[in-house]
């Protein structure tokens, strides 16, 4: 067998990686991966972190790849470099080298790594790599049924509408950038201040339209404004919202599914629930 090399994906590798991932994930097709890699090309990762991710190369062609979506994110007064590991695939004949991709990816220091869509059979592998589960399930909410009588004075605005009360400019950037990625970005406006929300349109089992909560300041804010937000999302024909959760969420009508869509992290800062900003769900649309 020819020598195996593991290195960063370069721009010249994009056509080969597109074909590799289209073969590895045939349900998505080449056009999806062309778009995904174009999104990564358009981003500016933090200094020292890869633009696309890493590949395994044999005899001059890619035989494995993992994408890294890297961002500098702010949580309160702190800032952290975060990388979402995504779309890990290695051709069957080279599976014994698959760990090289992970070890190279995890070699960056002072970075919090996320794995937010692992297949169930990989959970023990992920945990052996030092990842910890921080979200154990999801709550599927019907927010339009909530807050029918307790949310007067709240206005829901498209993020492109400038708020007239206090807001955080960094959150405005998050909403604008995610709207450009195809997400639904909203402000909930009270007389005192604004509250940011980002949702990704999805389909449950490829059939039922819903919205996935990508970003909010606190899940409690979503509970507080569930009614107005839910009624706004009904305009998009999305009656359900999927929220990361470790237990049923008081104040929301819906169903908690423990063990569904668990999230893992490794690094200096555990992500909070309600923050999937700049991850594969938003950037790639997986």
Question: Where are the predicted features?
Answer:
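A broadly used, surface-exposed interaction patch
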Residues: 47-52, 61-95
């Amino acid at each position: 067998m020819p020598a195996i090399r593991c290195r960063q994906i370069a721009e010249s590798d994009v056509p080969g990686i597109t074909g590799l991932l289209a073969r590895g994930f045939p349900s998505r097709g080449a056009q999806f991966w062309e778009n995904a890699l174009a999104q990564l090309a358009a981003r500016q990762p933090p200094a020292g972190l890869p633009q696309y991710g890493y590949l395994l190369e044999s005899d001059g062609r890619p035989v494995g790849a993992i994408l890294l979506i890297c961002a500098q994110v702010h949580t309160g007064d702190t800032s952290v470099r975060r990388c979402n590991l995504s779309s890990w695939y290695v051709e069957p004949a080279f599976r014994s080298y698959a760990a090289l991709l992970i070890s190279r990816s995890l070699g960056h220091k002072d970075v919090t790594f996320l794995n937010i869509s692992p297949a169930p059979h990989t959970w023990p592998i992920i945990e052996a790599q030092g990842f910890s589960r921080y979200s154990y399930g999801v709550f599927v909410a019907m927010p339009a049924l909530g807050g029918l009588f307790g949310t007067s004075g709240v206005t829901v605005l498209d993020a492109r509408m400038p708020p007239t009360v206090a807001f955080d400019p960094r959150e405005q950037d998050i909403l604008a950038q995610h709207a450009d990625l195809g997400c639904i970005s909203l402000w909930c406006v009270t007389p005192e201040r604004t509250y940011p929300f980002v949702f990704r349109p999805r389909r449950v089992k490829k059939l039922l339209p819903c919205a996935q909560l990508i970003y909010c300041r606190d899940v409690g804010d979503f509970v507080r404004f569930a009614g107005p937000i839910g009624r706004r999302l009904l305009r998009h024909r999305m009656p359900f919202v999927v929220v990361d959760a470790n237990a049923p969420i008081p104040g929301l009508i819906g169903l908690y599914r423990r063990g569904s869509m668990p999230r893992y992290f490794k690094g200096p800062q555990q992500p909070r629930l309600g923050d999937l900003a700049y991850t594969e769900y938003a950037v790639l649309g997986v």
